[in-house]
Amino acid sequence: MSENKDKNNILKRHIEEDNNIDNGKRKKLELGKDMEDVHDIASKEMEEHETTPIISQNLYLDTINRKLLDFDFEKVCSVSLTNLSVYACLVCGRYFQGRGPSSHAYFHALTENHHVFVNCSTLKFYVLPESYQVESSALQDIAYVMRPTFTKLEVQRLDHTPQLSYDLMLKPYVPGFVGMNNIKNNDYFNVVIHMLAHVKPFRNYFLLKNFDNCPQLVQRLAILIRKLWNHKAFKSHVSPQELIQEVTVLSHKKYSINEQKDPVEFLSWFLNTLHNCLGGKKSTIAKPTSIVHYSFQGFVRIESQKIRQHAEKGEQVVFTGDRVIQTNVVPFLYLTLDLPPKPIFQDEFEGNIIPQVELKEILNKYNGVHTQELAGMRRRFHLMTAPPYFIFHIKRFMKNNYFTERNQTIVTFPLDDFDMSPFIDDSFIQSNPKISTKYNLVANIIHESVTHAEEEFHNFRIQIRNPSTNKWYQIQDLYVEEISSDMIRLGESFIQLWERSS
């Protein structure tokens, strides 16, 4: 029995050894198959890599024509007129929708052999019809022209370091003092935007902040101001078409390129609308709620007194002021200055003489002593605060029952250190001894009347000081020229911008 057990144990041991050998061989065979599969896959990938051409990042970039690129106009597809997913062709400058196989940009690439496009929203560059993205430093200048950006150091240098730049045609221009396209009748619009673009805190705010989540009016104004101050521009002028389109929509077509308007009316509407778009609310003297109110808003005290008439039978009518005087403090963004009426009688020698008046004389309206009588009320005005910037509107047009009469009186003024203290309340001056009451002229909007074929046309141009060189430039639409400071006082000043001296 013991011999049989030993034989059975030996037999089991041999069977287990045979099984272990079979399992090892099986694992080796499986591992070998896996290695062969991996080798085959790698060989196939190498073959595919060798047969597939490598697409260069610089392919088609030499077809880009920067002289035809104009990103100032509204980003709308030239075929479907939609403003969604718009791409700009960098060969011809036209706008097309999408980049998929059924898009207008795709068909344009096939039919016109134009291959390089940029997404107008993301500023990413693509090659069509292959539809792959291109990342090249050679395209950064195009992205910068589409959406200029500024650093704090660059903004600080704008008013202290003289700059002279050149466009693609090697035409020199001074950033900030470039022409603005008059599409039809929008010169009233151009001069107002130019003036606002030279208000330092206002300008710096729109150069440095991010407005991606703001209303379109704010975004388009920021882009336009940045393009005005762009020192890497492709051309030495800009077009306000995108901003005007938004203004036309918000104003219900009251302000557009089709009809010329009063610049001061547009300025008032634009500042108030912009204040609301920036989230501003009704401000107090101590706390402005937007950059608009911070830069321009002041407060004026108005004392109103009713005028009563007394008369007895057979006696002359006598007008006396009511004993009750109502006092209100109201905010303002600009001050209206009334010109003295033109002389009624003129002899043959005085007929061609244009009257003159000093700026401080027409500002006496706000000295708190001068009275103004209108519509049965006697009023006195006195400035309660002095904002960083004063905007003066010199009222030149008076409407009567028959026509609008223009007052050609020339206003004379100093260019620097104009003292506003006689018109500001003493309490403000005493409580703010460090705030200067002297102001320097920054911009002067001129009105010009031209008669053609018995019809009168009104033109507006602006004269702006360059603080880095103290030179003056006159801008009328696309025409920019350097002028002498003596020329500033010779025109019919319509709107003036004064900056508090530091």
Swiss-Prot record:
InterPro entries: Papain-like_cys_pep_sf, Peptidase_C19_UCH, Ub_carboxyl-term_hydrolase, USP39, USP_dom, Znf_RING/FYVE/PHD, Znf_UBP. Pfam families: UCH (PF00443), zf-UBP (PF02148). PROSITE patterns: USP_3 (PS50235), ZF_UBP (PS50271). Zn(2+) binds at residues 89, 92, 108, 114. Residues 178-501 form the USP domain. It is found in: Nucleus. GO terms for biological process: protein deubiquitination; spliceosomal complex assembly. A zinc finger (UBP-type) spans 56-153. Keywords: Metal-binding, mRNA processing, mRNA splicing, Nucleus, Ribonucleoprotein, Spliceosome, Zinc, Zinc-finger. May play a role in mRNA splicing. It is unsure if the protein really exhibits hydrolase activity. Could be a competitor of ubiquitin C-terminal hydrolases (UCHs). Belongs to the peptidase C19 family. This is Probable mRNA-splicing protein ubp10.
